[in-house]
A protein has these predicted regions:
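Glycine-centered loop/turn positions within well-structured domains
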Residues: 7, 110-111, 238, 264
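Canonical Radical SAM [4Fe-4S] cluster-binding loop centered on the CxxxCxxC motif
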Residues: 2-30, 258
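Auxiliary Fe-S-binding modules of radical SAM enzymes
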Residues: 159-166, 176-312
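Residue-level recognition of short loop/turn positions
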Residues: 8, 52, 251-252
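A short acidic, helix-capping loop that chelates divalent metal ions and anchors anionic groups
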Residues: 18-23, 109-116, 180-184, 265-267
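Radical SAM/AdoMet-radical enzyme domain recognition
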Residues: 27-50, 54-172
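Residues that scaffold the ATP/ADP-binding catalytic core of kinase and kinase-like folds
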Residues: 8, 12, 58, 111, ...
């Protein structure tokens, strides 16, 4: 719902958010988002994830969530957030009706976290997670991008293991993905998630069979732990096999794949309430172009200049 982010993570926006001067379109208006959700819900979509950038920087963020929950047939509304104001907004997030919250925390080491994000906010974010748990919110996930020589050591893995032993949180490592403008960073820091998979196998974690509606994470459980571990490995052979996702950019472009080479604007069909049937027809017509796989392993990153553009 926005490309704006207040963090400066090295793998995404190392210099912070800078507006794209070649594209002067504004971000989707709340009414356009409502019409979009209505069309998708009538096509059978049951879950919407709000991403960015950082979605909570939008002044109408909570209003967007409430509209999706109360004025559409979408069953689950979830967000991915950096948690910058999590300690201050935890109750507001719950009261808005959100069904799930994914928080990006690349390290439990305060200095490492600061070096990656350029913000010293780890204590406040962890406090926010505790507040959410104290208020009874249970659908919490934490994502970390796996970075060679930064947060991919046994010490890092043990720290997260200790964390989820006491906290009912799903923690997932995401393999660093190459985008259009991070090739040097990718070459320096990419490491296969197999290193974490080996750690899990060596420490008694058991692979959990996925349901039909599951996401891309390979999940592992241990009866001695409250939380779960997960791996998101976009370079693995069967990563795209069960893909059930479509993406809409903050400016109204439909993307069939995070790393696809094509995208079309559907914004012209979000201007009036009576355009729903046209919108649905256009979306269904595009589905036949959804490919079986991305081509990341060949270095083809498609239209994704950085992940804030497509909601990675």
């Amino acid at each position: 719902i926005t490309e704006v982010c207040n963090f400066k993570c090295g793998y995404c926006l190392p210099n912070g958010y800078m507006a794209d001067k070649s594209d002067n379109r504004k971000f989707l208006h709340i009414d356009e988002i409502r019409r979009l959700a209505k069309g998708f819900s009538e096509l059978g979509v049951q879950k919407i994830r709000l991403t960015g950038g950082e979605p909570t920087v939008r002044k109408d963020f909570f209003e967007i969530v409430k509209i999706l929950k109360n004025e559409t047939s979408i069953k689950k509304v979830v967000i991915t957030t950096n948690g910058y104001h999590l300690d201050q907004k935890a109750k507001l997030l719950i009261d808005s009706g959100l069904d799930g919250i994914n928080i990006s925390i690349d390290s439990l080491d305060r200095e490492t976290f600061k070096n990656i994000t350029k913000h010293d906010r780890l204590p406040e974010i962890l406090k926010g997670i505790q507040i959410l748990q104290d208020l009874g919110f249970v659908n919490l996930k934490i994502n970390a991008v796996l970075l060679n020589g930064v947060n991919a050591s046994t010490k890092d893995f043990n720290a997260w293991s200790d964390f989820i032993k006491k906290n009912k949180v799903n923690f997932r490592y995401i393999e660093l993905m190459q985008t259009g403008d991070n090739l040097d960073y990718f070459n320096r820091y990419h490491i296969s998630s197999k290193i974490f998979k080996s750690y899990l196998n060596d420490n008694g974690w058991i692979y959990q069979t996925q349901g039909l509606d599951a996401g891309p994470s390979l999940n592992y459980i241990n009866p001695d732990y409250k939380g779960k571990f997960g791996i998101i490995a976009p370079y693995s052979k069967d990563f795209c096999k069960s893909c059930n996702r479509l993406r809409i950019t903050s400016k109204g472009d439909l993307r069939l794949c995070l790393f696809g080479n094509t995208g079309i604007s559907i914004r012209h069909l979000l201007q009036k309430d009576d355009q729903t049937e046209e919108l649905k027809d256009l979306i269904l017509g595009q589905m036949r172009f959804k490919k079986e796989s991305h081509y990341l392993e060949l270095g083809e990153t498609g239209l994704t200049k950085n992940l804030s553009k497509t909601g990675g």
